[in-house]
């Protein structure tokens, strides 16, 4: 699980600093891998090699929104829904994160590594 602390200015002009959480479960990663012929990781590698910026941006948006969620109070669940992802995508915090990933290769790689399950190979 990746926690990103983001400072942004909301639509009322108020500066906010908030924590946002991103995670992909083993099941989600497996589903992504099996949903693309040849595997998701191979497709990702090919897109990056091709320098298809439009596709890279589209893929990052998809990954950020798929990984976004909220931890339950007891820490047992990581709650995700289309509604939560859509609401998050309408914030300046999302815009800050998206721009960081779009403009900084190291930040993008750290994000992808951070959202992957720690024990994926096990």
Residue ranges and their predicted role:
Residues 1-4, 64, 77-81:
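A contiguous, well-structured "functional interface" segment within a domain
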Residues 28-62:
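Acidic, aromatic-enriched beta-alpha/helix-loop junctions
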Residues 47, 67-68, 101:
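Generic structural signal for hydrophobic core residues of well-folded globular domains
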Residues 1-42, 108-122:
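Short, charged/polar N-terminal "headpieces" of proteins
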Residues 72-122:
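C-terminal charged interaction modules
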Residues 43, 59, 63, 97, ...:
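Charge-rich, solvent-exposed alpha-helical interaction surfaces
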């Amino acid at each position: 699980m990746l926690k990103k602390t983001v400072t942004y200015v909301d639509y009322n002009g108020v500066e906010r600093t908030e924590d946002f959480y991103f995670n992909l479960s083993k099941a989600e990663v497996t589903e992504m891998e099996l949903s693309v012929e040849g595997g998701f990781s191979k497709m990702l590698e090919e897109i990056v090699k091709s320098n298809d910026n439009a596709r890279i941006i589209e893929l990052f948006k998809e990954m950020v929104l798929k990984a976004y969620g909220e931890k339950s109070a007891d820490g047992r669940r990581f709650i995700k829904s289309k509604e939560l992802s859509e609401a998050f995508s309408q914030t300046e915090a999302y815009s800050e994160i998206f721009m960081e990933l779009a403009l900084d290769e190291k930040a993008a790689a750290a994000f992808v590594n951070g959202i992957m399950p720690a024990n994926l190979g096990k």
